[in-house]
Amino acid sequence: MDVNPTLLFLKVPAQNAISTTFPYTGDPPYSHGTGTGYTMDTVNRTHQYSERGRWTKNTETGAPQLNPIDGPLPEDNEPSGYAQTDCVLEAMAFLEESHPGIFENSCIETMEVVQQTRVDKLTQGRQTYDWTLNRNQPAATALANTIEVFRSNGLMANESGRLIDFLKDVMESMDKEEMEVTTHFQRKRRVRDNVTKKMVTQRTIGKKKQRLNKRSYLIRALTLNTMTKDAERGKLKRRAIATPGMQIRGFVYFVETLARSICEKLEQSGLPVGGNEKKAKLANVVRKMMTNSQDTEISFTITGDNTKWNENQNPRMFLAMITYITRNQPEWFRNILSIAPIMFSNKMARLGKGYMFESKSMKLRTQIPAEMIANIDLKYFNDSTRKKIEKIRPLLIDGTASLSPGMMMGMFNMLSTVLGVSILNLGQKRYTKTTYWWDGLQSSDDFALIVNAPNHAGIQAGVDRFYRTCKLLGINMSKKKSYINRTGTFEFTSFFYRYGFVANFSMELPSFGVSGINESADMSIGVTVIKNNMINNDLGPATAQMALQLFIKDYRYTYRCHRGDTQIQTRRSFEIKKLWEQTRSKAGLLVSDGGPNLYNIRNLHIPEVCLKWELMDEDYQGRLCNPLNPFVSHKEIESVNNAVMMPAHGPAKNMEYDAVATTHSWVPKRNRSILNTSQRGILEDEQMYQRCCNLFEKFFPSSSYRRPVGISSMVEAMVSRARIDARIDFESGRIKKEDFTEIMKICSTIEELRRQK
């Protein structure tokens, strides 16, 4: 029988049909090649938005800089970055007036954080620009390299382990006449292989010392490396994102801590909370506006979009905000917070890898590095690239472009939210002094504006006033991309509101399925995703049960672990059948060993090993949870692991799942090819770093959640801990006298070696 699909929706309220409009199946687009073109676009656009500002020259680096602050007021609707200092300061003052003590309290909270934060905070985060090697590295390695170079240049404050002391070193490093850096390089030579008698390329890794004068060092310290943002859906063009170096990161962290503390106290801020907490917070603002408008007023909501939010923001404005927010605070605190915006006012954008050229006729490919863009003949480029390069050339120094205005993506999300909320705050009647008033929600560059007024003319006037106020603070509401509706229907940060937030379950679809980490983690993540969607996204019991069955099926196909009594033939079926036959209690076998699935929607919160433990044969338990099993390279597993989930839209989310360490929690070995490249030295450093940390955590089992504070080195701490533990164990009879003497001897030897060094 034919079914008319519209019949499916007869009984469904319109807002519940949102999941059927889902366009994002399949993989998101990834970028290939270099991001140089996108970065040049960003730099050129940012300067265009501020073109009527004042040009100055940085005295230290010689970089030309454009300052649009307090520039001409806009006369048209084009996006512009001419924020007015006095307007920003006034908006801050009114924000404080409406929330007495907010800045004071946030400063006190932040001061406490500043004094307690350890330098290992900076090891969080993925790729970081490593100024010592002039390219991207994992954050931990970049930090280790920076500290190593600092110490070899006589900067020792960082040894205390406090972030604030590391930042003192950063400040001092900028005053030094020169800095000496050790870089890795690789030599290639052709040699004849003794066995095959063929010529092969042999690579050797060397380290060389390089001196950077003050100017070169400053340029590197102020450099943001750029990459292309991957996996962005719904965009035709890619765009560039920035990754700052270690000198900037610590200062940014403290500014964002202060801003986060302020955002937590602002009801219109969509940051730093997320998920259901965010929905509740936002629903409150909407409720307030609707309750007040029932009798005499009408209420409209704008689903807002700002044009090029961060390219029109300005670090000088952020400096003004911080100066105001911290005005009654101690000098040292004000200084440390003002450094991040000052560094951003003098930032340099690294243009990435450069351009790739290929000659079809000669089958040649060659890369033009970014450093050459400044003086290469433009006849090799097409028109659009030529225009870009001509525009950017005056700004280039050593392959980086001077970029004073603009913020680059994702740098000061919290602080820019505070700026946005300060405008929403001005919508109260006591400030508009007329019949219309507004309120709304702000989360980084995304906003929703709710305007109330007695009639349509009032609504229009309110929107116009909001639009112009934004212009004064360097925020450009896009008239083309924002749309207005009766209050009750709008979208904000991919949450759709229709008389309440609508669960858009389809957004989560990409995170269903098998993640491909290992059998143990994948099972756990799979059921956790289903559980979370039942809690947060209106995933009903019947659908959840179906999702679970589909997941188990998918899982069995991925790992070729169909039930032991199935007819499906795979390359694992021989072993799995054999295990099935010799197992007494078949219900105790894990799904990944060909066992049955015992999950249903009531027990999704229990890890599979725990669920089946009582049902397992004893020898199976022994094999499954045996840390000495020689066939498994084990990593030590915390009881809770983090998986990164990619929803269809919006930022990647961290999801916790329970991890029980079994022989299925294997870790794939690192790809061998890296060992032949210039990365090898770095890899060895990284492993060394890892080993030291692991050893340290063996001595101080609690160190994973609380770093020891003090001035003794790691080695001293471990030696003294070993002595104390040994004495306690000896006195309580846990170890023999010979062992005790042996331990003491080793400790003395270590100390002796340290003294000699």
Curated annotation (Swiss-Prot):
Which Gene Ontology BP terms does the record give? DNA-templated transcription; symbiont-mediated suppression of host gene expression; symbiont-mediated suppression of host mRNA transcription via inhibition of RNA polymerase II activity; viral RNA genome replication; viral transcription
Q: Name one GO cellular component term.
A: host cell cytoplasm
Where the record annotates domain RdRp catalytic, the positions are 286-483
The protein's UniProt keywords, in alphabetical order, are: Eukaryotic host gene expression shutoff by virus, Eukaryotic host transcription shutoff by virus, Host cytoplasm, Host gene expression shutoff by virus, Host nucleus, Host-virus interaction, Inhibition of host RNA polymerase II by virus, Nucleotide-binding, Nucleotidyltransferase, Phosphoprotein, RNA-directed RNA polymerase, Transferase, Viral RNA replication, Viral transcription
Where does the protein principally reside? host cell
One of the entry's Gene Ontology molecular-function terms is: nucleotide binding
Task: Provide the catalytic activity annotation.
Answer: RNA(n) + a ribonucleoside 5'-triphosphate = RNA(n+1) + diphosphate
Assigned EC number: 2.7.7.48
| Keyword Metal-binding among record annotations | no
Q: Where is this region: Disordered?
A: 50-82
Q: Which InterPro entries match?
A: RNA-dir_pol_NSvirus, RNA_pol_PB1_influenza
Top-level taxon of origin = Viruses
Post-translational modification, as annotated: Phosphorylated by host PRKCA.
Name the enzyme group at the top EC level: transferase
The record's region (Promoter-binding site) falls at 249-256
Its annotated compartments are: Host nucleus; Host cytoplasm
Residues spanned by motif Nuclear localization signal: 187-195, 203-216
Which HAMAP family does the annotation name? Answer: INFV_RDRP
Record's subunit section: Influenza RNA polymerase is composed of three subunits: PB1, PB2 and PA. Interacts (via N-terminus) with PA (via C-terminus). Interacts (via C-terminus) with PB2 (via N-terminus); this interaction is essential for transcription initiation. Interacts (via C-terminus) with human PKP2 (via N-terminus); the interaction competitively inhibits the interaction between the RNA polymerase subunits PB1 and PB2.
Question: What is this protein for, i.e. what is its function?
Answer: RNA-dependent RNA polymerase which is responsible for replication and transcription of virus RNA segments. The transcription of viral mRNAs occurs by a unique mechanism called cap-snatching. 5' methylated caps of cellular mRNAs are cleaved after 10-13 nucleotides by PA. In turn, these short capped RNAs are used as primers by PB1 for transcription of viral mRNAs. During virus replication, PB1 initiates RNA synthesis and copy vRNA into complementary RNA (cRNA) which in turn serves as a template for the production of more vRNAs.
Which family would the database say this protein is a member of?
Belongs to the influenza viruses polymerase PB1 family.
Query: What name has this protein been given in UniProt?
Result: RNA-directed RNA polymerase catalytic subunit
Q: Which organism is it from?
A: Influenza A virus (strain A/USA:Albany/12/1951 H1N1)
List the gene name: PB1
